[in-house]
Amino acid sequence: MNSSRFLYRSRQFWQAISTRSSQQDVELVSSILSPVQVELFQRMQKSEQFHSLVVLNELRNRGEDNTDLLTAALLHDVGKTQAPLRLWERVMIVIVRAICQDCVQKWGTFKIDHPEKGLGWRRAFIVAEQHPAWGADLAAECDASPLAVSLIARHQEKIHPEVSSVDDNLLRKLQSVDDNN
């Protein structure tokens, strides 16, 4: 891990233990999400809410105003509410990804019907790999648009560089900001 990535992860760690939402954040979220979607957003851990707000604000700073994209920015990690990660589990995922990306994917593909029950040491990897699908299901239950649901479901998916549908272009924008924050 290079020094800039280490500093980035250190900043993320500090934010995970010290974040608080402002009234302005609450108003911004409420201006984009429906009341039931706001409730879903509020179920996320504070650090996940903060991350989602950073992703949202970066997209807006880039001039993005597509409602589906902004909804996905706020709810892309909502699947993690199914089995909230502890701080040490987040750290473990980062370390293992740095050493063996394929291991995270392999260990995380184990089929699980009840994520809240966990699976011992695999639990964190399962959440890391499967939260997009869980989040898409939750967003769909809260009447998010099909495009927002698709963006949430696919936010960790690798996109072929030659594909240029409107949906994939929005997904690239979400992934770019999410990956850097």
Language-model region placement:
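Non-catalytic interface/linker regions that flank or bridge core catalytic/transmembrane domains
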Residues: M1-E39, Q156-V163, D168, D179-N181
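Divalent metal-dependent catalytic cores for phosphoryl transfer on phosphate-bearing substrates
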Residues: V38-H51, L56-N181
